[in-house]
From Swiss-Prot:
Residues that hold Mg(2+) according to the record: 14, 134
GO molecular function, one term: magnesium ion binding
Entry EC number(s): 3.5.1.-
UniProt similarity note: Belongs to the YdjC deacetylase family.
Transmembrane segments: none
Biological processes per GO annotation: carbohydrate metabolic process
PANTHER family: CARBOHYDRATE DEACETYLASE, YDJC DEACETYLASE FAMILY MEMBER
EC top class, as a word: hydrolase
Designated name of the protein: Carbohydrate deacetylase
Location of the active site: 13
Names of required cofactors: Mg(2+)
Amino acid sequence: MAFPRVRLVVTADDFGYCPRRDEGIVEAFLAGTVTSVSLLVNGTAAESAAELARRHSIPTGLHANLSEGRPVGPARHNASSLLSPEGFFLGKMGFREALAAGDVALPQVREELEAQLSRFRELLGRSPTHVDGHQHVHVLPGVCQVFAEALQAYGVRFTRLPAERGVGSCAWLEAPARAFACTVERDARAAIGPFSRHGLRWTDAFVGLSTCGRHMSAHRVLGSLARALEDIPAGHALTAELMAHPGYPSVPPAGGCGEGPDAFSCSWERLHELHVLTAPTLRAWLAQNGVQLCAIDDLDSKRPGEGVPL
């Protein structure tokens, strides 16, 4: 398949979740496929992950978390709309349900985001290269506005826009996963306005919703890129991001963000992604199709190209 000129960022999410996860992420980075990582500052291994990032000079951003584990901000010590009675975030769907019901106080969201940005600076000694959202919370209605405000206040320019073209037609996705991916895509498109108004940048194309876990293969990554880049004029230079979740499976009770590792973290699917990313097939296919791997901080500080279809 013939691509236009493409620079691809491959981001490994959930850095800091547990040492075994981090071991796999670093392995994929050293293999040359993963080019960027997103750190969970409330992860149980956040401090050791930060040391790994420094040791290996890994471009590192913040994986803003409002849905799993314990907070790092004022909510730790006070009653908060973000937390369950047990003091944990409400979960991927629980947070969405509370937000839709109007039960989430957005000023508390802003406080937690700023606390995580500050914690990142404490751990790494610098600002994040980018900020995205754990379980895509950053593009949710209302949250996307305070998220954009917080990033602007902290001088962060790059984020992720998880709008993957054609994800609704990916028949290999189970119905619940496909429905969730379509909802994320819809929310991402609605977040473009707030993100743009606050000067945020993101890649021209995004893939990863359709290639998560067991669904990742070199063939599907290339196919997702092809869909994302359809109708791009010849000679147009493009940027794209592949979201990935590589790592060795967590072994309970180690890992997580304060309440232990989740099922996906403990499954073989993380290891499957690691194998796909470190095998020579994917890198060879990308190179054959003119795709150049790069880090997020290698990209031009400009908004996505005009005329690029979303």
